[in-house]
Amino acid sequence: SQEPVSTWAVTKDVTFSLFQDTYPEKTEKLTMVMENRGDKEQTLYYMVEGWKGDIPASAGYFHAFYRQEHPVQKGRAYTVVDGLEGKGQFVGLCFAAGMNGHNTCWVEGEPKMYIDGGQHPTINYTGTEDYFCGSYGFGNDILQKQYQTFSGLYAGLYAITGNDSSEMYNGQQRFLLYRFHIQDPVYFSKSFRMTMDNLGWTGPRYDDYTSVAYWYLERPGALPAPLPADGELVMR
């Protein structure tokens, strides 16, 4: 598939913008749906821009998939995406981690990618924060007792909500992150799946994990699973 371009712009609480390569001409139409799954009326406005031109023969079909586990089953890895079949490219993900434990780091788990049916991970990252281009607990300053958020073009820990960051690992915090594989593309020929451990210094944890994964396939594919029920579709 063609090298993708993916850029997000988020204004706190009110605006979500996405700039993404898609090719509706390959299917003659592009349908976008905004569904209100709550019990109150909401105000929505939108604008869609596009460019029409020649489509590369190698251009893939864009896919996105939402998944959550609230909480992650203790001792079992969180599945970011699985069941992808065919030839394609994994683009990246947006990720949220909500703390349910205390007095321990949550980033000791290893993100793992299994490409083309391998029983062992083809790519095994050294830790959760390392995958999101951080290190050492996202630069948690022991003296200042404060996390260091950052926002880059391809990766970032752009926000921390919940208790004040001076609580360090003891607070009920929510970490919001993203990672896009543009400079380090991830290709697959037959299949792809990705998992992420939920581990701390003292062992397995039971935090709330939420993610949206993005990928391209050479032909349209079914999503791995349906969305959660309305009552479960909540960021805790």
Where are these regions (language model features)?
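Beta-strand-centric surfaces of beta-sandwich/beta-rich domains
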Residues: 1-236
